[in-house]
UniProtKB/Swiss-Prot annotation:
Alphabetized SUPFAM superfamilies for the sequence: TNF-like
Gene3D superfamilies assigned to the protein according to its UniProt record, in alphabetical order: 2.60.120.40
Species per Swiss-Prot/TrEMBL record: Homo sapiens (Human)
Disease: Late-onset retinal degeneration: Autosomal dominant disorder characterized by onset in the fifth to sixth decade with night blindness and punctate yellow-white deposits in the retinal fundus, progressing to severe central and peripheral degeneration, with choroidal neovascularization and chorioretinal atrophy.
GO cellular component: apical plasma membrane; bicellular tight junction; cell projection; collagen trimer; extracellular space; lateral plasma membrane; plasma membrane; transport vesicle
Coiled coil: none
SMART domains named among the record's database cross-references: C1Q
Protein name, per record: Complement C1q tumor necrosis factor-related protein 5
Signal sequence, renumbered to the chain: 1-15
Residue ranges, annotated region (Disordered): 15-125
Cystine pairings recorded for this chain: none
Low complexity bias: start-end ranges: 83-96
Organism lineage string: Eukaryota, Metazoa, Chordata, Craniata, Vertebrata
Any Gene Ontology biological process: protein secretion
């Protein structure tokens, strides 16, 4: 019986197609076979997909300080700033030249009088019309120069009861002389005269009637006799008075 079974199995094995070693039909499991030889390296596979972004790493340590860069280009000009506070006053500067020219002028007239004037002496014109600088003395009748320069003096006299001769006098010397004859007519006559003269500080000018009968200067409420003078131009810059 046993030999018949063996023959039957061999016949089946010979008539069957080859089978994969791993698929040999077996009624009973056999022992594990020997390990096979390693296979050949396969071809390179396709690139895989990008992986997910990783998490942010921890902050790194501060780096070393770098070198300073080159200066940049000048920026645009800014808007004007607010006005600053006033500074302290500076020192006083040197004195400048006089911007207002010096002045000197006067005018006076005689009061009404029946008494003849003194001869060969200064003739007072006691009623002051203008004397802002105070250079004329109404008591003595003398003008005293304070501003050096060229002056003009004038006398306008009413002549009555006698002929009149008078002089413009500078420091005791006559600089101009004038005369008017009176012929006894009932109405007064007139006599005018003037002169221009250069004066220095403290020079004096006055009017002086002549000696003798030529003293017919007159004044009343309706007619006057006047003495006037004024500075034409000054050379004060060369005088110690204005130094």
């Amino acid at each position: 019986m046993r030999p018949l079974l063996v023959l039957l199995l061999l016949g089946l094995a010979a008539g069957s197609p080859p089978l994969d070693d791993n698929k040999i039909p077996s009624l009973c499991p056999g022992h594990p076979g020997l390990p096979g030889t390693p296979g050949h390296h396969g071809s390179q596979g396709l690139p895989g997909r990008d992986g997910r972004d990783g998490r942010d790493g921890a902050p790194g340590a501060p780096g070393e300080k770098g070198e300073g860069g080159r200066p940049g280009l000048p920026g645009p000009r800014g808007d004007p700033g607010p006005r600053g506070e006033a500074g302290p006053a500076g020192p006083t500067g040197p004195a400048g030249e006089c911007s207002v020219p010096p002045r000197s002028a006067f005018s006076a007239k005689r009061s009404e009088s029946r008494v003849p004037p003194p001869s060969d002496a200064p003739l007072p014109f006691d009623r002051v019309l203008v004397n802002e600088q105070g250079h004329y003395d109404a008591v003595t009748g003398k003008f005293t120069c304070q501003v050096p320069g060229v002056y003009y003096f004038a006398v306008h006299a009413t002549v009555y009861r006698a002929s009149l001769q008078f002089d413009l006098v500078k420091n005791g010397e006559s600089i101009a002389s004038f005369f008017q004859f009176f012929g006894g007519w009932p109405k007064p006559a007139s006599l005018s005269g003037g002169a221009m003269v250069r004066l220095e500080p403290e020079d004096q000018v006055w009017v002086q009637v002549g000696v003798g009968d030529y003293i017919g200067i007159y004044a009343s409420i309706k007619t006057d006799s006047t003495f006037s003078g004024f500075l034409v131009y000054s050379d004060w810059h060369s005088s110690p008075v204005f130094a």
